[in-house]
Amino acid sequence: MTFEGQYYHTLKATIYDKPAQPVPIYISAGGPVAAKFAGRYGDGFICTSGKGDELYRDQLLPALEEGARAAGRDPSTIERCIEVKVSFDTDKERALKDTRIWAALALPAEEKVNIHDPREMEKKAETVADQAYRRWLVSSDPEEHVEQVGHYIELGFTHLIFHAPGDDQSRFLRLYAQEILPRLRKRWG
């Protein structure tokens, strides 16, 4: 590929180690129009948790399937991914406290849309930090947590991406690998 851009120029650039198969394209959607587009053109669909079952069950997943069928595709061939906001710790207070780091998630979209300075966003988020946990699956009980997460599998998601809020990610990964992942695999494969 030859390219003459403002900052970069290439002359007959190529990739020598091309993948054996085409790179899958995953399309993110937060509403039915984008989900339908993902069904028509994507290899996978991605959305985020914490928005209420009605959005997934009644809007996003049906629109994804509608888009796939309209394109003559089998909807079951499209991977359904969801980024699940989880705060799991053997200490419930710590699990709750960890969610405060992402307090901005508790702000309504209309309050965030015109904030461009991270310091201003942080200040605004402090006003709702005590409500941040509402956007997360918070638990200290492994069985309870597996039930919370499994709900997304039951809704029809085929790939779960876990997002933990705390600042000790090593601790989270160790606890999740020991306490949660084996239980999820045992129950749902």
Where are the predicted features?
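Active-site-adjacent structural elements that line small-molecule/cofactor binding pockets in enzymes
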Residues: 1-189
